[in-house]
Amino acid sequence: MKAFKAYDIRGEWGSDLNADIAYRIGYFLPDILVADTFLVGRDMRVSSDTMFDALTRGLTDRGKDVDSIGLATTPLVYWSTAKYGYKASVQITASHNPKDHNGLKISAANALPVGYDTGLNRLEALVASDTPTKPCANKGQIRERNVYADYLAFQKQFVGDLSNLNIAVDCSNGMSSLFAHELIGKAHYINDTLDGNFPNHEPNPLEANAQEQIKALVKKEKCDIGLLFDGDADRITFIDEKGRFISPDLIIAFLGDFFIGEQKQKGIVLQDIRSSRAIQEYLDRYHAKVETWRVGRAYAALKLRELDGCYGGELAGHYYFRDFYYSDSALLAASIVLRLLAERKKAGQTMSQIIDEITPYSNSGEINFKIERKQEAMDAVRDHFTQIEKPERFLDFDGYRLDYPDWWLNIRPSNTEPYLRFLCEAKSQSKLQELIGTVKGIVKHFACLFIAVMLIGLASCQDPAKSRIYMDEGNKLMMTYGKFAEAEEAFDKAIQYDKNNYEAYYLRGCAKINEKKYKDAIADLEKAIELKPDYADAYFNIGRAYFLLHDEEKACEYYKLADHYGRPNLEDYLRKCQ
């Protein structure tokens, strides 16, 4: 069944999930988790009430009682499960997925996550089977339970004096709206009412278009920091006072100032395999040990508990805490980051200065290759580098991670899509670009074979008219609505129907700049120039991309080429090159 994922159940409501499936999930869940009473919370999505009714009807038809805590953040369900000793719980949410999706996050006793390998596989088999459902004679009851007061009292012990901070908060019209005002206090709030239609932006804090409003608010109000929550408040990202996105893994290092520096907690710090080496280097001041593990809550929460680690985090913006029953909480992470920043501000430090102190590295960000032969490509990358030099550290439990003295890389497969995900970090921008180029060259062979198979039949059906339709669609998405990811997909289709459409490559490159995918943008813009060598705007935007990568020398080179080919109004840009 399509909705059963590695970490949870999630999919489009009405197709991947519906009331009948939700009922059967509730009915068969007691076969996976033995409990007399199930704790259930839900988010504010349009379909969540319907899903709650169907799920709980399935549970009560099996004779199980339900304690409903009503509208809840996902971390509130985790906390309540462990705090009150429930043996099983369900949160109805699709987290950061689009508005027409919904899902279920299932936990066992102590808020231990139930993933595909630890129960969802068996549940899927039962739900998909022909096994009939039959209400029992002694049906269970649904009771309302109010846990808000206890939860807020727990959270408030981590809140510091924030009176010297100017804070911006974007709740994404999601569940953090329930508690943000009370825990954060005075701030500039946007999108802080519950709305399952997500009218302002998608509730995914890693998406560039979701970050636009909070970045603008930070700059407009001259804030010290911006907070951007996801839909169910288990993830958060931060924006510095300059309006720049902070890579979430670097916050793992900063949290150490509180847990290890101030509270003197003992125990390992957990990071995922994509996380920066800067975390360990920063935490060396506390003689802390950082353990690297697999991506995903189903793995991280269990590993942190196994290690009795004090806290941990992921590149995706999840932060886990021993004090939070080894589970993740965006609001708790926010409280601690704000508390630390308030103290640092008294000493004259800004958020950007703190991050610069944490990391000396240039980072590629995650680069995706569309490819079927993922394992072969990964092996080829591994073999290329290990044959040149033995790495200082080699990890192979979530793809491969190779660590060398001045750089490292991770290459890992997507579990659900034909993508190979690559990320690297180096102490110099030149080394970073060299690594990216090398890996692209290795993977290109495997990717091209896959693309060649996909394009059989397309080669003989090039259609410039269809290409123009997708071009216009992408341009509207990008220029009118600011939906850069969707625009990129439209330009992909435009290129499929006309591989010589230089404008499509150019516009896709511009979309990628807005998504902060600068290196990929440069590749598209260079392709546009290959097809149209005098394309002044393409030269100019390559210059922009290099400038945003802090390579001013290359930026100036392309600004001058743009000027040479007749792009007007470049005086301010060229002045920087004097």
What do these predicted ranges mean?
Residues 102-221:
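Gly/Ser/Thr-enriched, mixed-charge loops and adjacent short helices
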Residues 265-423, 429-448:
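Phosphate-binding and adjacent anionic-ligand microenvironments
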Residues 466-468, 502-503, 536-537, 569-571:
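Helix-start (N-cap) detector for alpha-helical repeat units in TPR-like alpha-solenoids
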Residues 1-57, 61-63, 142-164:
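An N-terminal, well-structured beta->alpha segment
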Residues 38-102, 183, 187-239:
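N-terminal small/polar loop signature for handling phosphorylated ligands or for N-terminal nucleophile
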Residues 507, 541, 573-575:
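Canonical tetratricopeptide repeat
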